[in-house]
Amino acid sequence: MQNIDLISEEEAQKLLEELADKIAAYNHAYYIEDNPLVSDSEYDQLFNTNLKLEQKFPHLILENSPSKKVGAKIANKFAKVMHQVPMLSLSNAFDEQDVRDFVDRIKIFLRLNEFAPIFCEPKIDGLSFSAVYKHGVLTTGATRGDGYVGEDITANIKTIKNFPHKIDNVPEFLEVRGEIYIEKQDFLNLNKEQEEQGKDKFANPRNAAAGSLRQLDSSITAKRPLKYFVYSGGVTEQNLASSQDQLLTKLKECGFNINEISKLASSEEEIFAFYEYLKTNRENLPYEIDGVVYKLNDFALQNRMGFIARSPRFATAHKFPAIIGQTKLLSITVQVGRTGTLTPVAELEPIEIGGVTVSRATLHNFQEIARKDLRIKDYVFLQRAGDVIPKIMGVDFDKRPNDTETFDTPLFCLSCNSKLHYTPEDIIIRCDNGLNCPAQNYERIHHFVSKNAMDIEGLGRKQVEFLIDKGLISNPLDIFFLKEKNDSSLAKLENMDGWGKKSVENLFKNIEKSKNVSLPRFIYALGIRHIGEQNAKLLARAFGSYNNFIAQMELLRTNEPDIYQKLNNLEGIGDKILVDIIDFFDVKENIELIKKLGEILNIEDYKETREQSSLTDKIVVFTGSLPTISRAEAKATAEKLGAKVAVGVSSNTDLVVAGVDAGSKLKKAKELNIKIIDEEEWLTLIKNV
């Protein structure tokens, strides 16, 4: 990763665009597919790089910035549940200084002179849930989803042992939130059963819990050893208690499982002592934890602190360092992705790290192999932080055998044998053979049918590979003529290995169902390089309809300047992504394929959904010292209500909130005849909003 201190604005913009798409893909894999693609530590590193870039270049913050979002858009197989209060993620602290900074921010924000008590509890490595009770009866269970809309898992959550279906002496409407998990020993037993039944094993306890909870058939969930802890309320917690410790006591009285391992800390020293205790004893716990959560104990103070885009200000997660192991590097294989990117993968002698058997690790790019001087038969250090794909940290040079073998970067594509064009300085190496490369074509079709694209259930990797190998499909369009081809063929799909009458019927139904698709999902399904879900949404918003989109994209091939300018003006579409879009639509076959898809699909026009308030899009300026609230708190409240907080007064300013000793900004506001109010009027205004 580039040095943030030395990076130019142009480089920063490109990197922010790349990070937005990359992190969005990782979020989807983790939250929706229960299949993390990178380690926690690598994800955190990418996310922190994004934050540092945004802090240095705030004017470059993208609409689809990862810092504004949590989780991922939910899949379509479950009904949607809107969270009345968003289920946001937590910011991370990686060392003691980060924790001290967290405590200091609380003091500054709230203007406190003393340490405010902090509630400390283990961070369970499971799946977050919400459960709603009306008149004491469980009515809705939901996953976090994207933080705003989750999946309805009511039937499944009711199968969990000791999960209350009915509770007494509570408000008419009660929401509790917590974590569903599988204990370590239960995970090992479950994987043993999976293996005996010839089914795929789960990667880790979290994946097992997530996969078990997100079953369409609740009888399958009922057979899984799921457990839970509740750790907060949603819209009702202040009706039950005035602090976190009181709330958990009340929830326990209601019959919920709470984690008894906790600490109400009255100093930083007590916080760190609890962290060290859990870090030392984590292996002795029956379940996996990956850190400690710190929350302001007082709910009134929590409310004053509020939230930023994706996390609360009043809480943070102090992460544990990753688990380190050592094993032998057996070989290095190369994968070819849908856009032609070649990625090296380390094949390892299987090793158990933190209860999970690891046999592969991504090497990200070929420069990393040279930089770390990795050789086949080397003994390497692995880092794992609770997820499926570990990271190779380096080589144990003291144990290097005499017969190690260096890895030669390929000169030709391992799939189509076309020559790879790159220089030794290139980080990313690609095959430029496009859809003539079997590996790229396979990955493109698999991407097209994936959950967040066309979402054709029943077409996983194995099925796509089978259909291509049998010559039944060769491009995305062929999928929609598969039934017609099968009906007229003597060799029926249902009679082939791995298929049956029911599975084929369901597949054809799902293909037909997928023909109704939103414009953002359709654009994402095309597999344009660097066009992830968020950038696909940007394009859909810009062009509105399929017909306008394809017409404008055809103009790209005629070098029409207006369309270049329109794309260039889109926030989030930089020069690099613009080149990728142009390259994609410069291929005549791509245009023809999209047109044919447009003839058989019902592609819905883009629809914007946005909540409004009387302050939405209003430009507000704060000046002077506010008597009872900090400037940070005032700004946070304004932004929460949809206002845009500016640092200077201009003719575009809608409102100025003036405190004590307001100077030139107040004077300019008067000159421009802009509405001016004091803190008391501001507090009344936001209360009424």
Curated annotation (Swiss-Prot):
Signal peptide span: none
InterPro entries: BRCT_dom, BRCT_dom_sf, DisA/LigA_HHH, DNA_ligase, DNA_ligase_AS, DNA_ligase_CS, DNAligase_adenylation, DNAligase_N
Cofactor: Mg(2+); Mn(2+)
CDD domains tied to this protein: BRCT_DNA_ligase_like, LIGANc
Swiss-Prot/TrEMBL catalytic activity: NAD(+) + (deoxyribonucleotide)n-3'-hydroxyl + 5'-phospho-(deoxyribonucleotide)m = (deoxyribonucleotide)n+m + AMP + beta-nicotinamide D-nucleotide
GO molecular function: DNA ligase (NAD+) activity; metal ion binding
Pfam family, one: HHH_2
Domain of life: Bacteria
UniProt GO BP: DNA repair; DNA replication
Top EC class for this record: ligase
UniProt domain BRCT: residue ranges: 610-689
Keyword terms, alphabetized: DNA damage, DNA repair, DNA replication, Ligase, Magnesium, Manganese, Metal-binding, NAD, Zinc
Family label: Belongs to the NAD-dependent DNA ligase family. LigA subfamily.
Function: DNA ligase that catalyzes the formation of phosphodiester linkages between 5'-phosphoryl and 3'-hydroxyl groups in double-stranded DNA using NAD as a coenzyme and as the energy source for the reaction. It is essential for DNA replication and repair of damaged DNA.
Protein name: DNA ligase
The species this protein was found in: Rickettsia peacockii (strain Rustic)
Gene of this entry: ligA
